[in-house]
């Protein structure tokens, strides 16, 4: 089978063009009362940009397959998400600066609420980051080792934290200790090979110990652990595409993914405006910028239509600031769809906009799911987005005589 990434890499050339990939996490949606959040939002700048752009829609993995954020992003970065399957734990861990060694398995965890059988809230009401950090500190003091495996906790954002398991004979082929839906009984971790069975056993015992330590907390009284992973070996983005690549993201997982593929992590603030200010400050330092906006996904998962609309409008307001930097290529898309009615990731194609001097402009009137479905790019695999970005930037040689 053709390795598209290797094929494209052989055609890559260098020049002084700049590419911006703006990812609005979970952007795609389905109509509520006749409109999607993208349609309902006031987006004069995105709509104006759409008139000068090529539009389409992407499939992150395969038609009908619902992707996680990891596969969705890997695909956007030009990697085959089926070939390179990466646990979410390593992404979250790298994103918050955790050192991961050969004897380590890391996993992403959520604080949760349960009643002793059923998981009532998979995010424990989304506690503030500061509150979660105090709980992580308590766990660090109470739980240090299970059997011969050292346990280390690291706080993340809101309800999220990272667990590192350090010991001999640990595997990462472990199913998630998470029912994935609220109102369902707990689903415990299972190992798919002998080393991973040990990891699963330790993880399940850890969850029981966490529940014991937190039994008097009315909301944060349980944990879900998933995305077990060791450090994977991936080809590096800057080497494949000959780009100085910088990542601007506020959430650890996305910083971790960017770091894993070899991008440089650029420190930034917590808001969209902070991220754009960082883009301006670092504009001369990189050829390629990955800019990530998280809240479109968060509000989709929470079923909050109006809030998702507001985030889209917030992004729309900064589009002129991005264009003022005069990028040669601006790509705006999502890593997957997170429809408000579903309150979850979905299989729906993802809106895609590519702006450059070389687009077939004038064929689209607005940026939304339905205009994108009719767009000039058609429906493409998300792993082809990087190839297109390079082509629009004049960074690919002709193939063949």
UniProtKB/Swiss-Prot annotation:
Pfam family, one: PhosphMutase
E.C. code: 5.4.2.12
InterPro entries: Alkaline_phosphatase_core_sf, ApgAM_prokaryotes, Metalloenzyme, Pglycerate_mutase_ApgM
Isomerase is among the record's keywords: yes
Catalyses which reaction(s): (2R)-2-phosphoglycerate = (2R)-3-phosphoglycerate
UniProt keywords, alphabetically: Glycolysis, Isomerase
GO biological process, alphabetically ordered: glycolytic process
Disulfide feature: none
Single Gene Ontology MF annotation: metal ion binding
Pathway it works in: Carbohydrate degradation; glycolysis; pyruvate from D-glyceraldehyde 3-phosphate: step 3/5
HAMAP family: ApgM_B (MF_01402_B)
Protein family (similarity comment): Belongs to the BPG-independent phosphoglycerate mutase family. A-PGAM subfamily.
Functional description taken from the UniProt entry: Catalyzes the interconversion of 2-phosphoglycerate and 3-phosphoglycerate.
Name of protein: Probable 2,3-bisphosphoglycerate-independent phosphoglycerate mutase
Gene responsible for this protein: apgM
């Amino acid at each position: 089978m053709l390795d598209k990434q290797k094929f494209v890499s052989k055609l890559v050339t260098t020049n002084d063009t700049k590419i911006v990939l703006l990812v609005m996490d979970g952007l795609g949606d389905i109509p509520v009362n006749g409109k999607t959040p993208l349609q309902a939002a006031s987006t004069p700048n995105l709509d104006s940009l759409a008139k000068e752009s090529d539009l389409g829609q992407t499939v992150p993995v395969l038609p009908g397959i619902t992707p996680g954020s990891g596969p969705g992003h890997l695909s956007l970065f030009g990697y085959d998400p089926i070939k390179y399957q990466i646990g979410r734990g390593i992404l979250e861990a790298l994103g918050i600066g955790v050192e991961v060694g050969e004897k380590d398995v890391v996993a992403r965890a959520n604080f949760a609420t349960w009643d002793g059988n059923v998981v009532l809230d998979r995010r424990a009401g989304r506690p503030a980051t500061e509150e979660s950090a105090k709980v992580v500190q308590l766990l660090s003091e109470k739980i240090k080792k299970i059997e011969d495996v050292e346990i280390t906790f690291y706080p993340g954002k809101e309800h999220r934290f990272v667990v590192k398991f350090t010991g001999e004979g640990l595997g990462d082929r472990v199913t998630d200790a998470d029912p994935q839906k609220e109102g369902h009984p707990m689903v415990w971790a299972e190992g798919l090979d002998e080393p991973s069975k040990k990891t699963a056993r330790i993880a399940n015992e850890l969850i029981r110990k966490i529940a014991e330590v937190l039994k008097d907390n009315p909301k944060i009284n349980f944990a879900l652990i998933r995305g077990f992973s060791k450090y994977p070996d991936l080809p590096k983005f800057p080497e494949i595409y000959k780009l100085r690549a910088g990542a601007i993201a506020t959430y650890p997982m996305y910083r971790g993914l960017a770091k894993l593929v070899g991008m440089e992590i650029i420190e930034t603030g917590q808001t969209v405006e902070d991220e754009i200010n960082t883009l301006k400050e670092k504009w001369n330092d990189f050829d390629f910028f990955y800019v990530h906006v998280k809240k479109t996904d968060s509000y989709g998962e929470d079923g909050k239509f109006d809030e998702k609309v507001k985030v889209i409008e917030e992004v729309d307001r900064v589009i002129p600031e991005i264009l003022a930097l005069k990028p040669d290529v601006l790509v705006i898309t999502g890593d997957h769809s997170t429809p408000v009615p579903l309150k979850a990731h979905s299989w729906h194609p993802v809106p895609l906009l590519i702006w450059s001097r070389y687009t077939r402009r004038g064929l689209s009137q607005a940026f939304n799911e339905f205009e994108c479905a009719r767009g000039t790019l058609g429906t493409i695999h998300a792993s082809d987005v990087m190839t297109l970005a390079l082509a629009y930037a004049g960074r690919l040689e002709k193939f063949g005589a």
